[in-house]
Amino acid sequence: GIYGAAVDKDGNFWGSQLSQGYLVNINRQTLQYKTWPMAAGGYGMTVDSKGYVWTCSSTVARFDPMTETWQTNSVGGSGGCMEDGKGTLYMSGSNSSIIAVDTDTLQVKTSYPVPQYVHGISIDFYGYVWGVSMGSEAYRLDINQNGAFQTFAGLVGAYTYSDMTGFALSNVGQPCG
């Protein structure tokens, strides 16, 4: 079944399966669907501001809906991922870090260390990158301050790998009315 899901700027549904399954697209207007084999195993997934679909794990994979082709790169990721609307995809790093990936080249731009492994990644409307552990802490990373971060403690069994701030809705479009 579908594990990760997102909506593109045209309101179409995208879903990915856990590990190396299939990417699914459902057209919002016709409800017709298409599937493609995933190019690499994926855990997290997102649709970026340019309409590319990403699956994230140890390998980052970018799907181009126009050409129906994949590009991949091994980046040492692990869990969730999200794009900032400015050309950087942030993802969970496998070694207690948050990895910044260039969305054009798929190359690692930099890696920001955090105190423990974070599984969930999200970006808020102020541009802060959030990482959530699977335990009791979340970190708010300020990329404009060389990766300085604040720790938010006292969480109980925190778990997410998806958009926890609502920022990904910026890629969907403006509401009508």
Features from the language model and the residues they span:
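Repeated scaffold domains used in trafficking and secretory/extracellular systems
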Residues: G1-V7, A39-S49, V75-G85, P115-F125, ...
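Conserved beta-propeller blade signature
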Residues: N12-S16, Y52-T55, T88-S92, Y128-V132, ...
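Blade-level signature of beta-propeller repeat domains, shared across WD40, Kelch, NHL, RCC1
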Residues: V132-C176
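A short beta-strand motif characteristic of beta-propeller blades
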Residues: L31-P37, E68-S74, Q107-P113, G147-G154
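Short loop/turn segments immediately following the C-termini of beta-strands
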Residues: Q17-Q20, S57-S58, G93-N95, S133-G135, ...
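A short loop-to-beta-strand structural motif that recurs across blades of beta-propeller domains
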Residues: Y22-V24, T59-A61, S97-I99, E137-Y139
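Short loop/turn segments that connect beta-strands within beta-propeller blades
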Residues: I26-L31, F63-E68, D102-L106, D142-N146
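Loop/turn-rich, solvent-exposed surfaces of beta-rich toroidal or solenoidal domains
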Residues: G76-M134
